[in-house]
């Protein structure tokens, strides 16, 4: 069972598209169709507006916090085809970089695991995915995967830096042999997995097919040291799938239908321990799902968005009536 512990009045003048807590859970970033990005201090249940960032010329779809080892850095992407990277310096938030390399709306931004350095993946409606790597002295290197998804890319999500199974297989004191990977979802109804080659170029490693409409979001689950990789995906078709891969080569992925909703599903997000999946969609609910001992996914709680402190525990029998 979950309950609403805090409600933030953002004072956005239009629809809010994304809200993300920072690493420490003390700051909340929001973005809206009013073209603004706002940052709030939400410690102790409060809400203090820290920054109102203006720089986009269209609806802002998504925000993403970088790991705090690089400072207070936030990325935002917009319908205006731009990605803006904001940084706090001496208590003031300022635009530190603007990426204008896409020909259409940029729909998703996601920072790579901090082990790799400061790397940002950006998915766009022009079908391309760009990867921005900070090289120092305010400079960013750009690599682009053209035609990553026909019609457009809606979501990007990095694989964890910890190699699956490394906590039990890795020799003591030896640095893991990281292989950079990320997943993307697009308007071609596909999830694609991408891998960085030895020459630094990105190659499509796998196509995952199960959805019958646009893939709206993908989320690669955090690694907890087990020799398994897990990805959640959701779609315009109302379905949420959980994909698992148990082989070391990463070539065999098996989908399991978590649930078929009666409306579009916009977002999926894993808990830090990768055992609970949050799902939100057009039914105006956020539902939490957990895998039972028999391998079935069970809805353990739901919260009606915009309805205040509603808390409901949903049994496996009830979920089938939703």
Swiss-Prot record:
Gene Ontology, cellular component aspect: COPII vesicle coat; endoplasmic reticulum membrane; GATOR2 complex; lysosomal membrane; nuclear pore outer ring
A GO molecular-function descriptor: structural molecule activity
Gene Ontology process terms (BP): cellular response to nutrient levels; COPII-coated vesicle budding; mRNA transport; positive regulation of TOR signaling; positive regulation of TORC1 signaling; protein exit from endoplasmic reticulum; protein import into nucleus; protein localization to plasma membrane
WD repeats: 11-50, 55-96, 101-144, 148-204, 210-253, 260-299
Phosphoserine: modified positions: 184
Keyword entries, A-Z: Acetylation, Cytoplasmic vesicle, Endoplasmic reticulum, ER-Golgi transport, Lysosome, Membrane, mRNA transport, Nuclear pore complex, Nucleus, Phosphoprotein, Protein transport, Repeat, Translocation, Transport, WD repeat
Topology class, membrane: Peripheral membrane protein
Protein location: Cytoplasmic vesicle, COPII-coated vesicle membrane; Endoplasmic reticulum membrane; Nucleus, Nuclear pore complex; Lysosome membrane
Pfam families, per database record: WD40 (PF00400)
Protein activity control: The GATOR2 complex is negatively regulated by the upstream amino acid sensors CASTOR1 and SESN2, which sequester the GATOR2 complex in absence of amino acids. In the presence of abundant amino acids, GATOR2 is released from CASTOR1 and SESN2 and activated.
Entry-annotated residues carrying N-acetylvaline: 2
Quaternary context: At the nuclear pore: component of the Y-shaped Nup107-160 subcomplex of the nuclear pore complex (NPC). The Nup107-160 subcomplex includes NUP160, NUP133, NUP107, NUP98, NUP85, NUP43, NUP37, SEH1 and SEC13. At the COPII coat complex: interacts with SEC31A and SEC31B. Interacts with SEC16A. Interacts with SEC16B. Component of the GATOR2 subcomplex, composed of MIOS, SEC13, SEH1L, WDR24 and WDR59. The GATOR2 complex interacts with CASTOR1 and CASTOR2; the interaction is negatively regulated by arginine.
Entry's family note: Belongs to the WD repeat SEC13 family.
Name this protein carries in UniProt: Protein SEC13 homolog
Organism: Bos taurus
Lineage summary: Eukaryota, Metazoa, Chordata, Craniata, Vertebrata
Name of the gene: SEC13
